[in-house]
């Protein structure tokens, strides 16, 4: 996922950003159950705050659980405030609702996922 941020011009050092994400993950898993994970990090290696989504063909091990739908939040380390934690909290609450999870999992396109996230997260 970090390589895609490089390709999009949102990150210059994807391996360093990835290391920041895994360091955060080592503190406490961001797996939420329901096959969802929300890795997140404030990093000096991200140029522009970004929400990235991966819908995997098969689940992967994520902490003590599995994840098949990954929503990665990356925010520039110098960004003001706690925006990423507000988005993380709002997203985690949404994921607790089966209707929201089903809408994400069954979305027909990347645009449909983006629209749903923008609406629910008030972006």
Describe each region flagged by the PLM:
Residues 1-123:
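Cytosolic covalent-transfer regions centered on His/Cys nucleophiles
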């Amino acid at each position: 996922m970090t390589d895609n941020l490089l390709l999009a011009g949102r990150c210059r050092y994807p391996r360093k950003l990835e290391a920041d994400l895994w360091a955060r993950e080592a503190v406490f898993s961001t797996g939420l159950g329901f096959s969802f994970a929300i890795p997140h990090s404030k990093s000096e290696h991200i140029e522009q705050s970004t929400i990235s989504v991966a819908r995997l063909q098969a689940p992967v091990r994520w902490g003590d659980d599995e994840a098949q739908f990954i929503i990665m939040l990356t925010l520039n380390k110098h960004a003001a405030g706690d925006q990423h934690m507000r988005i993380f909290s709002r997203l985690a609450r949404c994921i607790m609702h089966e209707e929201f999870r089903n809408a994400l999992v069954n979305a027909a396109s990347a645009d449909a996922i983006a629209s749903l996230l923008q609406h629910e997260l008030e972006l």
